[in-house]
Structures are given as C-alpha cells and as structure tokens.
Amino acid sequence: MLDSEIYKFQYRRRRGLRRIYDVTINIVQLESGVFAYESWVHFAHEFKGNGLVFPLVAKTSTQAADEARARIEDHIENLVGLDE
C-alpha cells in the first residue's frame, strides 16, 4: 500500500508580479521506498501549473517534504512548468 501525505502552503514570488501562490503537494512513498510528488499551483483560484516533477532523493518523509517544497518554490521563481 502506498503512503501519501498532502501539504498546503502559500508562496510569494520574489520577482515578476510577486504574487502569492497557493501550493498543494502530494508526496507518496512507493513500494520500492522511493519518494515521488505531484504539485498544483494556483493564483486567485486559477490553476497555474504543476512545475516539473521528478523522483525525490530523500530517505525520509520529512526530507521528501522539504525537497519537494524547495523544488516547487524554485519552479515558481523561475516559472518552470507554470504560467504567471
């Protein structure tokens, strides 16, 4: 059975329009032990994208959450896989 955790937070972009985005991240630990994630980014209830999604290198769920959050924050800053 897969173990899944949902995290929600807001992130303010530091450049461009400096909007505050609502972010949802779903982190799952696969049966192999590898962590993966999917993210959804919204602004004013409008879907802006998922960013790019790759497997995580983290070994614990806490590390996976931190790694996924850092990745999506970087994607928001650089508009990678997202619309402003």
Residue positions per predicted region:
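A short, structured beta-strand/loop element
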Residues: V23-L52
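Mixed-charge, Lys/Arg-enriched low-complexity segments
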Residues: H45-E84
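Broad hydrophobic/π-residue packing in well-ordered secondary structure
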Residues: E5, G16, G33-E38, V53, ...
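Negatively charged, low-complexity tracts enriched in Asp/Glu with abundant Ser/Thr
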Residues: M1-T24, E46-K48, E84
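Hydrophobic beta-strand residues in large extracellular and virion-surface proteins
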Residues: Y7-F9, V23-I27, Y37-S39, A64, ...
